[in-house]
Amino acid sequence: MKLLLLLALLLGAVSTRHLKVDTSSLQSLRGEESLAQDGETAEGATREATAGALMPLPEEEEMEGASGSEDDPEEEEEEEEEVEFSSELDVSPEDIQCPKEEDTVKFFSRPGYKTRGYVMVGSARTFNEAQWVCQRCYRGNLASIHSFAFNYQVQCTSAGLNVAQVWIGGQLRGKGRCRRFVWVDRTVWNFAYWARGQPWGGRQRGRCVTLCARGGHWRRSHCGKRRPFVCTY
């Protein structure tokens, strides 16, 4: 009898011990699963935060895509319509008189370049009237410029006449991607001296080119404006 009681006590102690071990193991497993879930949650939050810091909001992407540069030649702009020279005279050819000698300054290109004669005309004309005067009165064209040295020479001459801008022979032709600048005397366009923001920036959308007496830079201007001009002959 005592032996049976002793065996029962031993079996109860062993069962209680196993139960504690199983409970501890279960708690340990649950703790590890909880830590793993917490780690995955933290890692996912880190990934989301990183992605949010690097990627702009959809509204920002749309705004960035919609923003354009004013220097882009393909940007929509209000600009002067292209008009052929023969139809742009504001008055009849008979009403256009050749400039008086006292209203002009004649000069020649600098040594080292092809010698040509030039005349700075102080009386203001529209671009095409000026070109007509150059052809009729001097058997030439509005001047084309192919070097910085000659550009500086024209600048100094125009400054001597106390004028702000003068017409030179540059003109914008074509539309859209086919737009390009040409010289009215049909020489190659191999030199330019544009002011900052020109020729595609700023508010000037004319198709004709002026040279500024201050600085010698070029600007686009509406061809119908009246300005002094430079002829070659």
From Swiss-Prot:
Region annotation Disordered: where it falls in the sequence: 24-96
PROSITE patterns xref list:
C_TYPE_LECTIN_1 (PS00615), C_TYPE_LECTIN_2 (PS50041)
Q: List the disulfide bonds.
A: C134-C231, C208-C223
Using the record's annotation, list all stretches that form the C-type lectin domain.
132-233
Name where it's found: Cytoplasmic granule
Q: Where is the composition biased (Acidic residues)?
A: 58-93
Q: Which CDD domains match?
A: CLECT_EMBP_like (cd03598)
GO BP: defense response to bacterium; immune response
- SMART domains cross-referenced by the UniProt entry: CLECT (SM00034)
- Which GO molecular function annotation, any one, does this entry have? carbohydrate binding
Record's compositionally biased regions (Low complexity):
42-57
Q: Where is the signal peptide?
A: 1-15
Q: Which positions, given as ranges, span the membrane?
A: none
Give the UniProt keywords, A-Z: Antibiotic, Antimicrobial, Disulfide bond, Immunity, Lectin, Nitration, Signal
Reported modifications of this chain: Nitrated.
Concerning InterPro entries, the annotation shows: C-type_lectin-like, C-type_lectin-like/link_sf, C-type_lectin/snaclec_domain, C-type_lectin_CS, CTDL_fold, EMBP_CTLD, Eosinophil_major_basic
Q: Does the keyword ATP-binding apply?
A: no
Q: Which residues form the propeptide?
A: 16-114
Q: What does this protein do?
A: MBP may play some important roles in the allergic reactions and inflammations, since MBP is capable of releasing histamine from mast cells and damaging the epithelial cells of bronchial tubes. Antiparasitic and antibiotic.
- What protein name applies here? Eosinophil granule major basic protein 1
Organism this protein belongs to: Cavia porcellus (Guinea pig)
The gene from which this protein is expressed is MBP1
